[in-house]
Amino acid sequence: MKANFGGIKMQLEHPSVKTIEEVENPAARRVQYGSLIGLLVLLGCYFLLEYRGNGVAWTWMEVYSVIPAMLFMGATLSGGLTRPVRNRLIFGAAFLIWFAVTKALHRIEGVEARSIGVFFCAYGMCLPFAWASGDGKRRRGLKWILGLYLGLGALLVLYGLMLLGGCVPGYLRDAVYWDGTRFSAMSHPNVCAPLLMIGIGVSLMCWGRLNKVWQRVLLILWIGVQFGVLILTSARTTIVFTCVLLGGSLFCALRKSGWKRFAIACLAAVVLMGGLFVGSQMLSKVHKTNMEASQTAGEIKNIQYGWGSDIKNLNNRTEIWSSARKGLRDNPRILLEGTEYSGLILSQYNSFRVYHAHNSWLQVLYDMGLPGLLLALVLTVVVVYDALVLLWYNPEPMKSVAALLVLCILGCSFLEPYLFGAYMEKQPIQFLFLLLSGYLDCWRAELRKSK
């Protein structure tokens, strides 16, 4: 099967990647796609229904997301398993088994196990979906979930505009509000921000499908609006990586063969990233000044330091990581089985309340011990390798943007526990990350076969 992208024909054939018509059991494929639709319905309810904390949508996600995952696993195991599918199922099963073991050990100690369903869904369904469903070329499931996250970006923009205009409905005021001077939705500004970054990334993936100038102009304006709402969250790490995402996408679009075009693409990307970063800081200062002028000192609950302080201690992250090291030193049992009390342990070693380690890999060490950290590192290496290969060959804009988005999510996870854990409010980020990771692996295999 051949595909034409921008006039460049590529052969996209790989023996392990089968379409729904080519498999021995098309009924199993329909169940796999149906399972993804079930997850999308749960995610859609989770995104729409506010306030979610201990509410119906939160419960649906936490309890019932295991159902589509189990249906998917059953359909996958009922069909023929190629080696890539088998390898990813084994890796996901290893992650799930160790997660279950640690939760069982914690349960023996009297701690209630939670979020098992969403973790099972993440590693039992989202990670192997692209290979197991043979969707690497058709991308039907990918289009569905990207459409959902595109709608989420629009929803967050609507929330931000309503908050700026002071017209948030009463039933949303507990979920959409100013956290000090920061725009907060989806439970916290630091959760809202990466979801907006994902919305921007999905919008960039649509670029190659728009052929008319006015369509692309509207898309640029829409991305600008999302970036403006992202600035309101004051999530500086996410803002930086969103600038990298936009600049990297421009680089991939302009990059051609030859050193001159390569240099021009690099220069354009650097100028765009620098301009966006400087502009975001200027707008953030103006917004903060206006908010502080309109609110009393008692209403400003959230205080953030300037960039000068952030460069020195990464907004207190270095102190938190030092506390995590001391906690591991004084509680070596964590290295074996993890703990449910990471926040309490970390708070003993610093002067402020800490709920987690503010690093995905350090947090998974606290949650699941060294075996969990090893599995997370293996997945990280594979994902980074797949993304870098796709960026190097730059086969088509959508794939390059997907690779950039995955790397940017990893970058944000260096300062927040977005990945590898069982925090409910962060599962939408992890779902998309793992799903995209599977597609990147499929596309890298296709690219290798075509060479």
Where are these regions (language model features)?
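N-terminal signal-anchor transmembrane segment
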Residues: 6, 11-79, 97-106, 159, ...
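Loop-to-helix entry and N-terminal half of a specific, functionally important transmembrane alpha helix
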Residues: 37-43, 218, 222, 387-416, ...
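Transmembrane alpha-helical segments and their membrane-water interfaces
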Residues: 70-81, 102-160, 199-202, 411
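Alpha-helical transmembrane segments of multi-pass inner-membrane proteins
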Residues: 143-171, 186-255, 382
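A membrane-periplasm/extracellular boundary helix in multi-pass inner-membrane enzymes
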Residues: 158, 253-307, 322, 326-329
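Long extracytoplasmic/lumenal interhelical loops at the membrane interface
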Residues: 170, 183, 309-368
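Transmembrane alpha-helices of multi-pass inner-membrane enzymes
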Residues: 246, 401-451
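Hydrophobic transmembrane alpha-helices and their immediate junctions
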Residues: 251, 259, 367-410
